[in-house]
């Protein structure tokens, strides 16, 4: 009863002294108002703290492999990240050929970028717009929204930055061949895959209408794929399976009219794969009835025919119903304009250093298909390397000095390590022994600059451009995000190799691409796999490896479940041919 008696006495006090209740109410309201005011209007001292600790603004252009990987990995609260892209999702592009034929649904391979960018300790925001100009002088990017805006809104706007990360990817390369842009389908985006799927169904529906002769039906059902790379080969395989496993059951009269042709300008398809895979793929396509025309270069395309020229100079005309163009990548207009501004107008892609920093722009980075690493060559810096290593200025290097400098060289120039592996050498000592043996010199305890040149003269042969794949872009995004996370620490304590043409060390270790292997689905539940160590596998077992790897590489559990369920649905019910 004590609590009740207490409240009874308190109530009696308010009743006997009304002014007491008024004072309490006024105090409560005033106190709450002060709290609200203090939150809405922080003190001048707080403003001073915020100014001192202003977050550095990172603008990221693009939501592809490089951009999504950068967002997922970045974990430093000192940055404010602004993502700008015309698409508000990340697409798992290796499965786009599967989307074209309904093996996998389009929504199963996309993840909203806001889900990826949503982090508790990193401030991130997204703008659905396309960047059309980069101004490195004023540190601004100019963007254009594709959304409708109200009377107060602006369709074009600019965004300033402290750091700019360019990950816009690339566009399909038409090589300025007449008619390609107007008459061909590309396979770079999810929308491209959806259009191809709709066109395939349209072709079968049109060919089923009465009043057409057989020649016109054959033309409508003739599907041409230009490009014998991984994308073109996989699409041709998917289309073949879609036609023979599903569509011929629904369109039985079209069974003997369908034809798939693959045009490749080189002497073989899948030239980036092992020779065993190339030969197997060509033999399988022949068995499947896919007409592979090697050494055929497209010269012209109109609305019903495609013209191709052989290496002998003979030009043939092929009637078609649909063309899928998959011959390589080209530079986007915004990147071309930016390259002209910074003196790279004659290049095909943005040139960066080994730290993915655009050459000539300290605060701008580029990764993925829009850029290429301009790897410095050892022989270009050989004099500076020797001078840096010769600490006693004696004109020769001792074995100790040689090994010390080679350790830094291996960090700075990845081609050295690649050369050692290609020659089966176990270390730097083997490289030196080989050079001495070739020159007929004795095994001396010191070497001069000419002997150093002789030892390293062949290593630059391993300098190669990285392939334009999602695997490379993803690794670059992860690498750059980790560099940003450790930027403050590495400013004080550099972790990179020694500066050959300067003092001190680089802040970070340079980017190193680690090739994890590649797949080439060939249809009929058969896949070719090429993994590091010259390991090649072809057949049904590799197909199951492909399933497991691609499922594990999804960016979220949502897409992982959707993709696997689509595969199961296809196994049970087949592919959907509805046009919706």
Curated annotation (Swiss-Prot):
Its main location: mitochondrion. It is a peripheral membrane protein. A motif (Microbody targeting signal) lies at residues 571-580. SUPFAM superfamilies: EF-hand, FAD/NAD(P)-binding domain. GO terms for molecular function: calcium ion binding; NADH:ubiquinone reductase (non-electrogenic) activity; oxidoreductase activity. Its cofactor is FAD. It catalyses: a quinone + NADH + H(+) = a quinol + NAD(+); a ubiquinone + NADH + H(+) = a ubiquinol + NAD(+). PROSITE patterns: EF_HAND_2. NAD(+) binds at residues 221-257. Keywords: Calcium, FAD, Flavoprotein, Membrane, Metal-binding, Mitochondrion, Mitochondrion inner membrane, NAD, NADP, Oxidoreductase, Peroxisome, Transit peptide. Residues 377-412 form the EF-hand domain. Expressed at low levels in seedlings, roots, stems, buds and flowers and, to a lower extent, in leaves and cotyledons. Pfam families: NDH2_C, Pyr_redox_2. The keyword Flavoprotein applies. FAD binds at residues 57-87. It is an enzyme of class 1 (oxidoreductase). It is found in: Mitochondrion inner membrane; Peroxisome. Binds 1 FAD per subunit. Belongs to the NADH dehydrogenase family. Alternative NADH-ubiquinone oxidoreductase which catalyzes the oxidation of mitochondrial NADH does not translocate protons across the inner mitochondrial membrane. This is External alternative NAD(P)H-ubiquinone oxidoreductase B3, mitochondrial.
């Amino acid at each position: 009863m004590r609590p009740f008696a207490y409240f009874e006495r308190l109530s009696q006090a308010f009743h006997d002294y009304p002014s007491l209740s008024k004072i309490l109410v006024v105090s409560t309201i005033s106190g709450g108002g002060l709290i609200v005011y203090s939150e809405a209007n922080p003190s001048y001292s707080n403003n001073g703290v915020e100014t001192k600790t202003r977050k550095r603004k990172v603008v990221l252009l693009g939501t592809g492999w490089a951009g999504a990987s950068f967002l997922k990995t970045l974990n430093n609260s000192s940055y404010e990240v602004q993502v700008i892209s015309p698409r508000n999702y990340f697409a798992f592009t290796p499965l786009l050929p599967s989307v074209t034929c309904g093996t996998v649904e389009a929504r199963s391979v996309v993840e909203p970028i806001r889900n990826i960018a949503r982090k508790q300790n990193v401030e991130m925001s997204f703008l659905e717009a396309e960047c059309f100009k980069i101004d490195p002088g004023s540190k601004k990017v100019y963007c254009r929204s594709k959304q409708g805006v109200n009377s107060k809104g602006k369709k074009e706007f600019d965004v300033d930055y402290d750091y700019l990360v360019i990950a816009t990817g690339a566009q399909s390369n038409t090589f300025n061949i007449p008619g390609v842009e107007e008459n061909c389908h590309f396979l770079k985006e999810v929308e491209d895959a959806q259009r191809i799927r709709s066109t395939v169904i349209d072709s079968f529906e049109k060919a089923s209408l009465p009043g057409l002769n057989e020649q016109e039906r054959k033309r409508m059902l003739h599907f041409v794929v230009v490009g014998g790379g991984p994308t073109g080969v996989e699409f041709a395989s998917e289309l073949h399976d879609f036609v023979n496993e599903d569509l011929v059951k629904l369109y039985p009269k079209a069974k003997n009219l369908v034809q798939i042709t693959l045009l490749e300008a080189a002497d073989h398809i899948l030239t980036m794969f092992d020779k065993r895979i190339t030969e197997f793929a060509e033999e399988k396509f022949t068995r499947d009835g896919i007409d592979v025309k090697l050494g055929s270069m497209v010269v012209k395309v109109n609305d019903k025919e495609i013209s191709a020229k052989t290496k002998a100079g003979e030009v043939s005309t092929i009637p078609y119903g649909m063309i899928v163009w998959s011959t390589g990548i080209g530079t986007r207009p915004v990147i071309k304009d930016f390259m002209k501004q910074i003196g790279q107008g004659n290049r095909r892609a943005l040139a960066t250093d080994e730290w993915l920093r655009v050459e000539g722009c300290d605060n701008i980075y580029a990764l993925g298909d829009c850029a290429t690493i301009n790897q410095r060559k050892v022989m270009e810096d050989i004099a500076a390397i020797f001078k840096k290593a010769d600490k006693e200025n004696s004109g020769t290097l001792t074995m100790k000095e040689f090994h010390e400098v080679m350790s830094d060289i291996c960090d700075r120039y990845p081609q050295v390590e690649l050369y050692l592996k290609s020659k089966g050498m176990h270390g730097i000592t083997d490289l030196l022994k080989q050079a001495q043996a070739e020159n007929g010199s004795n095994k001396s305890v010191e070497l001069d600059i000419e002997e150093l040149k002789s030892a390293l003269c062949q290593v630059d042969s391993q300098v190669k451009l990285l392939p334009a794949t999602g695997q490379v872009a993803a690794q670059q995004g992860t690498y750059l995000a980790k560099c940003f996370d450790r930027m403050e620490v590495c400013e004080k304590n550099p972790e990179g190799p020694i500066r050959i043409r300067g003092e001190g060390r680089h802040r970070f270790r340079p980017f190193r691409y680690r090739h994890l292997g590649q797949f080439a689905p060939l249809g009929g539940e058969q896949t070719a796999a090429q993994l590091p160590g010259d390991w090649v596998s072809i057949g049904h077992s590799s197909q199951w490896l492909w399933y497991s790897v691609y499922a594990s590489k999804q960016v979220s559990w949502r897409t992982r479940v959707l993709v696997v369920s689509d595969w199961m649905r296809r196994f049970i019910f087949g592919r959907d041919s509805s046009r919706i």
